[in-house]
Amino acid sequence: MAPIALYSESVAAAQPTKGSATSEKKELTPLEALAHQANSKPLPKIPTFNTFEEKRQWQLEHMAGAFRVWAREGYAEGISGHISVRDPEFEDRLWINPLGVHYGMMKASDMICVNFMTGQVVGGNTEIPANAAGVSIHSAAHKRRPDVHAVCHAHSLYGKAYSAFGKPLEMLNQDVCNFYNAHSVYETYGGVALSGEEGENIAEALGTGKACILMNHGLLTTGQTVDEAAFLYMVMERSCKAQLLIEAAVAGGRVQKQLIGDEEAAYNFKWNSDPETLYFEMQSHLRYEEYLSGSDYKN
């Protein structure tokens, strides 16, 4: 067996001491802070690209990969649900999934490019139409939020169950703090979003937050990358499940729920809900999907 490499104690002793000119520590990013001895090896960050074409292909591959992960999570339900990403070159265009293709079969080449200012299909897959309600919701969100590059929406079981309460999630555990003061509730159900007005109403309810609970409908999340938005959706779905279980447990009156305090929730939000961190969180799911099914979703 090969010997395990260990740091020499003399190395540690040779580090700058307090008061020396080089002793000031560089402030860690949230992602770096989550890794023990993070600066020993740089953690993978959101990549940059030399061309729009390279970034576009990367976005579409990760979008398709997110759908594959969602399929294993059990989020697929008929033609419901959609993910969109803003085109890196043309900021008035988004890419969205086609109508009726199962999440578990989605590929990068399936995606449709839509000008969200005009509603016209301008590229990508022209063999299958997009979901009209999806185009309405996502177009409105991208118009209203130029800072957002990806939007996710689905009718997953626990999200739509919890949405019937028409109230925000409570800070009941560490993970749900990703949404501390960063999610809202659309308190009106306006039916299938076939009109531009319903899409606009949803976008208005989203406001400046990361996510929105659509009453009697489902969940919607956003992100700087599709990875961030898709992972946030998974966190929100599980947070809805956790709260439903907790509400059922306390209904008998024998136990009480304990909320995380505002200070602690804000602290968790700062360190866990950073775009780089959430991007990194999704990568293990994508690697596992590739391990299970290969990389055909990138085609």
Residue ranges, per PLM feature:
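A conserved C-terminal secondary-structure "cap"
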Residues: 4, 8-57, 63-66, 210-213, ...
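N-terminal low-complexity or amphipathic/hydrophobic leaders
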Residues: 26-119
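Flexible, glycine/proline-enriched loop segments at strand-loop-helix junctions
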Residues: 53-56, 123-132, 185-193
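Solvent-exposed alpha-helices and their adjacent loops that cap or buttress functional pockets
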Residues: 75-78, 86-89, 103-106, 142-145, ...
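Short beta-strand scaffold segments in enzyme catalytic cores
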Residues: 82-87, 94, 160, 212, ...
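Short beta-strand segments
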Residues: 86, 96-98, 152-154, 214-215
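Short HxH-centered metal-ligating active-site micro-motif
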Residues: 117-161, 196-208, 217
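Class I SAM-dependent methyltransferase SAM-binding "motif I" and its flanking Rossmann-like core
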Residues: 157-194, 198
